[in-house]
């Protein structure tokens, strides 16, 4: 009986040791996983922020170029239609600078719909939900 008890005791110690090693391994794995997830998350966030900044800068550049072209085109149209004499059109203005200023200035007046109502004040119409008609067999 003594041998049997000693064998069970040794088995118990082995199970406890294995459980302790497993617990330690799981804890280490969890920490490494957490570190990995945080690293990937921080790199993803950096990439998104950098991407958004890049897109915003490119959009600003394109708006500036487009604004310059519109400004030049408007001047040519005004001169061609006789609204403004070509000599009266300011030559010292650089379309890129005017477009840059226009892109940076906020809208002073709210956008208006053709009927004169602002988009912000549009009435909320109530709607009624209809049940679909049952189709016959």
UniProtKB/Swiss-Prot annotation:
The keyword Aminoacyl-tRNA synthetase does not apply. It comes from the Eukaryota. Keywords: Cytoplasm, Phosphoprotein, Repeat. GO terms for biological process: chemical synaptic transmission; dopamine metabolic process; negative regulation of neuron apoptotic process; neuron apoptotic process; synapse organization; synaptic vesicle endocytosis. Residues 88-97 have a biased composition (Basic and acidic residues). One of its GO terms (molecular function) is calcium ion binding. Residues 20-67 are annotated as: 4 X 11 AA tandem repeats of [EGS]-K-T-K-[EQ]-[GQ]-V-X(4). GO terms for cellular component: axon terminus; cytoplasm; growth cone; inclusion body; neuronal cell body; presynaptic cytosol; synapse; terminal bouton. The modification Phosphoserine is found at residue 118. Signal peptide: none annotated. Sequence repeats lie at residues 20-30, 31-41, 42-56, 57-67. Expressed specifically in brain. Residues 88-137 are annotated as: Disordered. Phosphorylated. Phosphorylation by G-protein coupled receptor kinases (GRK) is more efficient than phosphorylation by CK1, CK2 and CaM-kinase II. The keyword Signal does not apply. Its main location: cytoplasm. Residues 98-131 have a biased composition (Acidic residues). It is found in: Cytoplasm. May be involved in neuronal plasticity. Belongs to the synuclein family. This is Beta-synuclein.
């Amino acid at each position: 009986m003594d041998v049997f008890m000693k064998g069970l005791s040794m088995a118990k110690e082995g199970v406890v040791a294995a459980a302790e090693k497993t617990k330690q391994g799981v804890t280490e794995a969890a920490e490494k996983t957490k570190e990995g997830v945080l690293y990937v998350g921080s790199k993803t966030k950096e990439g998104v922020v950098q991407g958004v900044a890049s897109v915003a800068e490119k959009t600003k550049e394109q708006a500036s170029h487009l604004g310059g072209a519109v400004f030049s085109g408007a001047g040519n149209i005004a001169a061609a239609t006789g609204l403004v004499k070509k000599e009266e059109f300011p030559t010292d203005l650089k379309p890129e600078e005017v477009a840059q200023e226009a892109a940076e200035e906020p809208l002073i007046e709210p956008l208006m719909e053709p009927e004169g109502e602002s988009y912000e004040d549009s009435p909320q119409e109530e709607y009624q939900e209809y049940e679909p008609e049952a189709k016959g067999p």
